[in-house]
UniProtKB/Swiss-Prot annotation:
Keywords: ATP-binding, DNA damage, DNA recombination, DNA-binding, Nucleotide-binding. It comes from the Archaea. Belongs to the eukaryotic RecA-like protein family. RadB subfamily. GO terms for biological process: DNA recombination; DNA repair. NCBIfam families: recomb_radB (TIGR02237). It comes from Methanococcoides burtonii (strain DSM 6242 / NBRC 107633 / OCM 468 / ACE-M). GO terms for molecular function: ATP binding; ATP hydrolysis activity; ATP-dependent DNA damage sensor activity; damaged DNA binding. This is DNA repair and recombination protein RadB. SMART domains: AAA. HAMAP family: RadB. The keyword Magnesium does not apply.
Length: 225
């Protein structure tokens, strides 16, 4: 009998509705889009909402989190909420691997979400030549595969963000990481800029929601709405 997976609400109503009730536990959700499209804002809000529900959040930060932005979204209880967000700040792809492995020990401590923002920031720097590219792709797949296994074993929400590249053939932006990363991610959401503060989220891949379905949301002073 198929069990109903728990979902984590982001408090961005259009996005939660797009995903059929929130971010699903037990799988990896990938969010990709160009710089400034709202990836980190969504991740911060997810971590904050997770803590508000009485659980801890793990946040692997490779982009450089803004403490001011966190305070804006978390509001007057920012200091208290921050106590239940475990932050890793790797400075290389190798350190990112160590942080990912470390989540297994910590995830037993009432953790509701693991976030990697971004999973591919250091990965891009490792793509020097063909041999190292193959090795690095395999390593990225291993990292995200490890998180997928952990998500299933502990029934945790796992969210990774991904950067994009310009695909000349299709004249469109595509996520970095190749087919293996796409395969491991059971839900994939693309974010697009549509105006000042206005964004569109589109489902690229989902187990129960139609691909190509979109929603509009706004980045405001106190989060994504």
């Amino acid at each position: 009998m198929k069990t109903i997976k728990e979902q984590l609400l982001s408090s961005c109503k259009p996005l939660d509705e797009l995903l059929g009730g929130g971010f699903e536990s037990g799988v990896v959700t990938q969010i990709f889009g160009e710089a400034g499209s709202g990836k980190t804002n969504i991740c911060l809000q997810l971590a904050i909402e997770c803590v508000k529900k009485g659980k801890k959040a793990i946040f692997i930060d490779t982009e450089g989190l803004s403490a001011d932005r966190f305070k804006q979204i978390a509001g007057e209880n920012a200091r208290k909420i921050a106590q239940d967000i475990i932050i890793f700040e790797p400075h290389s792809f190798e350190e990112q691997y160590s942080a990912v492995r470390e989540t297994e020990k910590i995830s037993t401590e009432n953790v509701g979400v693991i976030i990697v923002d971004s999973a591919t920031a250091y990965y891009r720097f490792e793509l020097d030549d063909e041999d190292s590219s193959i090795r690095t792709r395999r390593e990225l797949s291993n990292q995200i595969g490890f998180l997928h296994s952990l998500a299933r074993k502990r029934d945790i929400v796992v969210v990774i963000t991904n950067q994009v590249y310009s695909d000349i053939k299709s004249n469109s932006l595509k996520p970095i990481g190749g087919s293996s990363l796409e395969h491991i991610s059971k839900t994939i959401i693309q974010l697009e800029k549509t105006g000042t503060g206005s964004r569109r989220a589109k489902i690229w891949k989902h187990r129960s929601r139609p691909e190509g379905t979109t929603c509009e949301f706004t980045i405001t002073a106190d989060g994504v709405r």
